[in-house]
């Protein structure tokens, strides 16, 4: 991130001398080109370890989220408005693993961008689009869980497939339009022309964002985050109250309708708890990054490169977390994975298999 504050003088010669210091003794991204960026000074062993760690995250994000999408879209038992939101969220995380993480892996390890200036812009746009899409999906999922837990019997009539589709469309359109309008047009660099010119070298792919847009980015994170925290606080208060009521009723003879309502409420509370953990993981992954963005925007690139890379990869790894959370808490997801990896979903009528034997 960058700043447009005049109190930070950016001199092209001083920055280049800092970044290209002792360039003759260092490896360059492009040895035969002037103004080439300097490669990261990692040893071969360190490079191998970093590639393994980052590559594992990318593979996990792609394979894990592909399993989530396949499970929900294939098995009819999982065809519900809420699960379609989860499948769309998995699609956003899958695209992070496909279009963002592999290229960021090379940039982080080598310190060089070998994929051209055009894809550098697209890479930044994809990064913003898919990550904001995940945020908006999680916000809508939290609202869905609140409705389901607060009144589980009328929930199916309130959160319909039509409403789910509108939430999905909104999440994708807003995130894509915003990210491309900001990053592909270069609006984020307004007022930072001298800084961008000073930092530009062949083999680099850096995104400079002025203070105004950094603040707007932070608000786009903060508002949904506050909504999610508020909603899940209410959900757990309702869940606690329901648990107390069920305990009281267990000492009495309950009518059949009450028993059914209790079972439904219990199922919805469990779903809310699991998705609440996914939301918490998302917020914990993203909050340090946005705080650092604000600090850098107003204090001027004080974050060390290695620390910034750590924060970015914590964000990326969040795209691989949700499938692990589902696998840990959802028996139906574990069963679906087994059916998928063993090839049993290719059998006739496999979509009607019961994933909820209980």
From Swiss-Prot:
Lineage: Eukaryota, Metazoa, Chordata, Craniata, Vertebrata
Family assignment from sequence similarity: Belongs to the G-protein coupled receptor 1 family.
GO CC annotation terms, alphabetical: plasma membrane
Glycosylated sites: 34
Organism of this sequence: Rattus norvegicus
Location in the cell: Cell membrane
Extracellular side, ranges: 1-47, 105-125, 188-211, 296-309
SMART domains: 7TM_GPCR_Srsx
Name of the molecule in the record: Trace amine-associated receptor 7c
Topology versus the membrane: Multi-pass membrane protein
